[in-house]
């Protein structure tokens, strides 16, 4: 598997919410990442895919809720988010598509 394909396995999709839009005003971009990826992998993937310099990476894991479907209990998957802060002068425009 090539290095670029591995980077696409780390970064799943951008997250566009009100909170992520407010974070983008401070130079941060929010991505959904694979649950087993770590901060150095996320930093390397963002720098190689988008050609920017990363200042910091903060991650959070949101536990999946227990939901009921047709009387059966099920669980939504856990989601890991990465708040990637970029160096001054670097931007990623996720609203236009990747």
UniProtKB/Swiss-Prot annotation:
The gene is rplW. GO terms for molecular function: rRNA binding; structural constituent of ribosome. Keywords: Ribonucleoprotein, Ribosomal protein, RNA-binding, rRNA-binding. Part of the 50S ribosomal subunit. Contacts protein L29, and trigger factor when it is bound to the ribosome. One of the early assembly proteins it binds 23S rRNA. One of the proteins that surrounds the polypeptide exit tunnel on the outside of the ribosome. Forms the main docking site for trigger factor binding to the ribosome. NCBIfam families: PRK05738.1-3, PRK05738.1-5, PRK05738.2-4. GO terms for cellular component: ribonucleoprotein complex; ribosome. GO terms for biological process: translation. This is Large ribosomal subunit protein uL23. It comes from Ruegeria pomeroyi (strain ATCC 700808 / DSM 15171 / DSS-3) (Silicibacter pomeroyi). The keyword Ribonucleoprotein applies. It holds the Pfam family Ribosomal_L23. SUPFAM superfamilies: Ribosomal proteins S24e, L23 and L15e.
């Amino acid at each position: 598997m090539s290095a670029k394909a591995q980077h696409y396995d780390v970064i799943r999709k951008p997250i566009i919410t009100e909170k992520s839009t407010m974070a983008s005003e401070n130079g941060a971009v929010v991505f959904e990442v694979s649950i087993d990826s770590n901060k150095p992998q996320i930093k390397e993937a963002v720098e190689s895919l988008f050609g920017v310099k990363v200042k910091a990476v903060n991650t959070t894991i949101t536990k999946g809720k227990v939901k009921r479907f047709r009387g059966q209990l099920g669980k939504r998957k856990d989601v890991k988010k990465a708040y990637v802060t970029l160096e001054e002068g670097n931007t990623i425009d996720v609203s236009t598509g990747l």
